[in-house]
Regions:
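Conserved alpha/beta enzyme-core scaffold
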Residues: 1-198
């Protein structure tokens, strides 16, 4: 919801020739097709594409190839300066009036704000979109107030029930659950797992 909402406003404001660097793009991002046709978006960096947007891009909708990267690869692109973020629009379930935010309080809980934290650290401007303003200080904060330039209250940032759509999903498969448990055990026992870990 956040990407579509932001891009609709940006298009109405007349911006063109933008690079979109969204973590992943799925069925719900079909409205981006029209923004690409209108020249609002001309380049895309993402970890995955699905649905009508992917179909149209596969047919040559974009003049430039989409830059597909891993999750860790995106962090490297941003931190190395290869991918410069002029404005990061970060959808969070809740924050306080100064922008202190995490991903696990509020109605639209989304989990870790790992990508958003990297964007907040490296973007020239950070716009926080939230559906719930909580009392100051909202903590623990994954993104802190000194990283946020503007806060916009919106009706809805996303649908927590659909956070597992696309490539991410819940499983009941015993083998997959064993792999997940083993991975969690490695993280917990790595020596890096502590309060505030993301």
């Amino acid at each position: 919801l956040t990407v579509n909402m932001v891009m609709d406003v940006i298009a109405k404001m007349g911006f063109k020739n933008l690079t979109l660097a969204s973590s992943s793009l799925s069925d719900c991002h079909a409205p981006l097709v029209e923004h690409i046709r209108q020249g609002v978006v001309t380049r895309i960096y993402t970890s995955g594409l699905r649905g009508p947007l992917a179909e149209e891009i596969s047919r040559g909708l974009l003049a430039e190839p989409v830059q597909i990267h891993s999750h860790g690869g995106r962090v490297h692109l941003v931190q190395s300066g290869e991918l410069n973020i002029d404005v990061a629009f970060l959808g969070v379930p809740s924050c306080d009036e100064f922008g202190n935010a995490n991903g696990y309080t509020g109605k639209a809980c989304c989990g870790s704000l790992g990508y958003a934290m990297v964007d907040a650290d490296n973007a020239k401007q950070v716009v926080m979109l939230t559906e719930e303003l909580l009392p100051y200080p909202h903590n623990p904060a994954s993104i802190e107030q000194d990283q946020v330039d503007l806060i916009v209250k919106v009706d809805r940032v996303g649908d927590a029930a659909k956070i597992g759509a696309g490539a991410t999903r819940m499983t009941t498969n015993p083998r997959e659950l064993l792999i997940a448990r083993s991975a969690a055990d490695v993280i917990v026992n790595s020596g890096y797992f502590k309060e505030g870990f993301s």
